[in-house]
Design a protein with these regions (language model features):
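PRPP-associated nucleotide enzymes
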Residues: 1-140
Length: 140
């Protein structure tokens, strides 16, 4: 929630939260949408996507229950195991954007999935560590 709040503040946009309860590993049930998403284009943030169940369930709730106009998801790590690709393909998500912290598998073919490179930032961080310069300034 803290990361989403920080993004909302930087973008000067309102914040909504999808409250979910995890019943067991790799499954969750969407419980509530806290905030108004009706007729809005939603950016859904998560740390990682494994099987895609939570992400796709949240997107579905945002559209069907919350009335969102569209949903784009962003996550740091795309594990994408099991049914993840098919779930994303079949979902209401318009686009899913991952960082390339986990290499994209060549067999993964889904027009909704995009990757952003972290190579330049990692290289800069390594250089700063070597030069004994603050790495935290990269993120301010």
């Amino acid at each position: 929630v803290a990361r989403a709040r920080a993004f909302a503040q930087k973008l000067d946009m309102p914040l909504a939260i999808v409250d979910k309860r995890r019943q067991k590993a790799n499954s969750s049930e969407v419980m509530n949408i806290i905030g108004d998403v009706r007729d809005k284009r939603v950016i859904l943030l998560d740390d990682m996507v494994d099987t895609g169940g939570s992400l796709c369930g949240a997107a579905k709730a945002l559209v069907e229950v919350g009335g969102a106009k569209s949903v784009t998801a962003c996550a740091s790590h795309g594990v994408l195991s099991g049914p993840a690709i098919q779930r994303i393909e079949d979902s209401v998500l318009d686009e899913v954007i991952f960082l390339d912290t986990i290499p994209a598998r060549p067999e993964v073919k889904c027009a909704k999935i995009k990757y952003l490179s972290v190579a330049e930032m990692f290289a800069e961080a390594i250089e700063r560590i070597y030069e004994e310069i603050s790495v935290s300034k990269l993120f301010n």
